[in-house]
Amino acid sequence: QRQMCIRDRDNGIGMTKEELEQNLGTIAHSGSLDFKKDNKDENIDIIGQFGVGFYSAFMVADKLTVISKAYGSDEAWQWESSGVDGYEMTPAQKDTVGTQVILHIKPDTDTEKYDNFLDEYGIVAIVKKYSDYVRYPIQMEREKSRQKPEPDPKPEDYKPEWETYTELETLNSMIPIWKKQKSEVTDEEYNSFYKDKFGDYADPARVIVSRTEGTANYNALLFVPSHRPYDFYTKDYEKGLALYASGVLIMEKCADLLPDYFSFVKGIVDSQDLSLNISREMLQKDSQLKLIHNALEKKIKNELHAMLNNDRAKYEEFWKEFGRQIKFGAYSDYGMHAELLRDLLLFWSAKEQKMVTLQEYVDKMPAEQKFIYFAAVSYTHLRAHETKA
């Protein structure tokens, strides 16, 4: 903090002088993309293919320093730039192979508090938010305290003493829960993840795991809440699923992944087919996103129908919370989605004195009955008329 710097180092293969100039000295050059093109026949999962992510550091830093030593080389090189007048290359001293990136953080202004990025807990929060599921460990030396060993023999007037020490701590989880097989995760683990991630106090009514390879490659972990949020039927409610690209968060709530009638669903989608710096405008036109949307729509519908058939009591509780949204979906857009949603609808049957589906009503119709009869009023009003009659 005193030096206003963030130092990030790896233990990779490093870069030569020529590679530093090519990869960092050329804006929008992507070594990752070149690597994928050179190995297009292999199944490679790699992020960062546009070459502009590195330069986003200038949003918080007024100078970047990169020191790298390539594998098999005896010399190290330093690349440095203020983001204005090119860059400078100089020989450097580095004992180990790999790369170190130093961000020289900007001084605070009246409108921006850049020193927040130097706070230890702030850095941990940023890593947990955006890179918790990157499959490689992100470690940081953290200052901690512990009690010193007690002397032996211990004096009568002994008072415990504490000392500070630093410990290398892995900040990210690395293995996303949604990439595990459902058989490898307990219900308690799913429930705990849901409540921690989405701030709910109750367990979800349904956990949906979806994994697809082919035209659309993605992993999804979805949750049907057991109760509706307090602001669900207000303009303040935001639908959407957390969208990740190869384990890196690119959007907290991607509304385009869910139709309005399933807006109550919460969850996460992780796809290898999306780039890290894709914009909201590009997402709306992205063909992969449309494929994922269609697949999730079908999956959610099937899971809700399975709940209806296999756990009727739980489905009726779900219907009390979100049935209005399903009915609105069947009615809206001139009934465009009625065919998809009709098997999920429940109605109160005056004769049966319980909730029934349309199919259940039809199955019990007398042979001579040709129509479904209904009263377009609330059950309370209907009971009032029955009493008068």
Language model region names:
Residues 2-8, 380-387:
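Conserved small/polar residues in nucleotide/adenosyl-binding loops
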Residues 46, 64-86, 106-116, 121-383, ...:
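GHKL/Bergerat-fold ATPase module in large chromosome/replication-associated machines
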